[in-house]
Amino acid sequence: GADFERLMAVRVNDVMKASLRLGSVILLKGKYDVITDGKRYKLDGTGNPGMAVGGVGDVLSGVIGAFLSWKNEPFRATCAGSFVTGVAGDIAALRKGYHLLATDVIDSIPDAFSKYWPGYRFPLPS
């Protein structure tokens, strides 16, 4: 309701201010991840409570790093990394329930790509 919208607006505003102040992209994890470069923002609602375990933030960082290495600009890379990691976590939860390990999320990353980008081939290092 209205309270949720008000709280989200405050949260987004605070994160955007911090991003501008630091001159960097920020991803604030939560039920809805907030991703911003200070000028624009996205909310990502993928993922589930089973992902609140050690190592999933490391997985998220690695996926974002992969998108950065593929020459995506930082805001887009962070949005894509958040989405893919969240979808992978949702797929893992369908298979295993909410008692997940970070490796369950990792194992589901190829399926997350296949679901939204069928036939996608990962860029290989040159």
Enumerate the predicted regions with their spans.
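Glycine-rich phosphate/pyrophosphate-binding beta-alpha loops
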Residues: 49-51
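Active-site proximal loops enriched in glycine and acidic residues that flank catalytic Cys/His/Asp
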Residues: 28-30, 37, 45-46, 55-57, ...
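Glycine-rich phosphate/dinucleotide-binding loop and adjoining beta-alpha-beta core of small-molecule
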Residues: 1-46, 118-126
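Charged C-terminal helix
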Residues: 87-126
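Short, small-residue alpha-helix embedded
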Residues: 53-84
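Short, well-structured alpha-helical segments that form the helix of a local strand-helix-strand
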Residues: 11-20, 74-87, 102-110
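Short acidic (Asp/Glu) and glycine-rich catalytic loops that position anionic groups and cofactors
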Residues: 43-45, 61, 85-89
